Amino acid sequence: VTVTIPELGLLSLTDDETNLLNALRAELMSRRFDLELRDCYYNGEQVVRDLGISIPPQLRGLHTVIGWPQIGVDALEQRLDVEAWRYKDAPDDSGELEEIAEANELVAESQLAHLDSLIYGRSYAAVGSGDDDDMPPLISIESPLDMTVFYDARARAVVSGLRLYTIEDQDAAVLYLPDSSIHVVATNSGWEVIDRDDHNLGLPPVVRISNRQRTADRIGRSEITNAVMSITDAACRTLMGMEVAREFYGAPQRYILGAAESAFQDAEGNAKSAWETYLGRVLAFERDEDGEVPTVGQFAAYDPSVYTRIIDMYARIMATQLGLPPHYLGYTTDNPASADAIRSTEAQLVKRAERKQALFSTPWSQVFRLAILIKTGDLPDRSRRIETVWRNPATPTVASQTDAATKLVQAGILPADSDVTLEMVGLTEGQRRRVHADRRRAQGRQALTDLGNELAAARQAARGLDTGPEVADDAAVEGG
């Protein structure tokens, strides 16, 4: 009897799946060098390209770092603070969104996604089911160094995705497909499937958060552009030149004309070293046979202001490239700027932050729609109206925000107890909830007080009716 053992799809990839995995892996590897280069500039670990002209070979190992790329990226990312996610038409009925966000710590995790997107040009959010049926969906932020996707620009959706990782020093990967997520490990014979999750969602549970998109480049670009890297290299070379000049010319050179050889010898007639001659506090010379005294002079000392002026010029150029106020990069003037002038110089940075907020809102809405789809198996109509609540990137003063909100309330444009009014004042989502709770408690106490007053008045009126005839009779007797 011949028994045929059927091939288990769980243990192997199909030919199409294998080809797709290899294509995604090749795409990831082809872009990794560029991503790692941006990462080096952000961390200050880049190797500065030396021109080989003014730096001697002995000092080429000198490494100078200037953190302007990190300052520029961090200044923008620090203005991208998420407060909450909610439904546009029902902000008070957004409990399921709050549950998902709190379970995944998305307010904090979103900062990682935004930072990676600004550094690398993109980051990814992968959505999966929770460890337990009662647990909210799991949302993880993934680095573009380990993950990539194929994207359909027409549908504005991810077609497939791949994430690489390691399990006990063994290469592994997750292949994200519209109807399944496949976990594989690398073996000598190829990729071996260790888990296949047939979720049947109809789309891969992956969202790409892209930065600086263009119509012909939806993958996104980094804020650390080629211009930023070039200026950083130039500034580092200038700092390196200043270090070399300090080593060679920090101590001014001296010259002595007409001195005898004995002036450079010690008491025993041995020649003094160059350092002993240079560092001697007193130089004593004898007159020659003609009665002449040797001429002693000094060359002009090293002036570092030449280099500092060049660095200031690079700082202004870098501030223009990054859209930052020059004082963010250490460039200052003799006259300190006023508060209004500082806010004026930050206008471009604020506008860039507002654009990033609008750009990142769409992928975050897609992340929550995927989470709801995984949790409930269905997408309600209101899932299309999920919005991200951002903190004001302009960081205005509380006084100016309060003044603007007060004027709108006085003009009758906004009600005083509106949540929009509290949002304009600058209160966070949690603070607004506490204000509403305090108002409800105050209204409840006032309602109880009013009810008590009404009951007391009613009892007083009832007692007045009961005692009214007796009081009238007593008055008549007294009058008689």
Label each region the model flagged.
Residues 1-141, 466-480:
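Extended, helix-rich architectural segments
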Residues 194-344, 386-389, 397:
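Extended, charged amphipathic alpha-helical segments
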Residues 326-331, 378-386, 423-438:
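Short, surface-exposed acidic
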Residues 425-459:
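Long, highly charged low-complexity segments enriched in Glu/Asp and Lys/Arg with interspersed Ser/Thr
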Residues 345-359:
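Glycine-rich and small/hydrophobic secondary-structure elements
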Residues 362, 375-411:
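Extended amphipathic alpha-helical segments with heptad-repeat/coiled-coil character used for oligomerization
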Residues 124-226:
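Extended, regular secondary-structure scaffolds
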Residues 1, 243, 445-480:
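Glycine- and charge-rich intrinsically disordered segments
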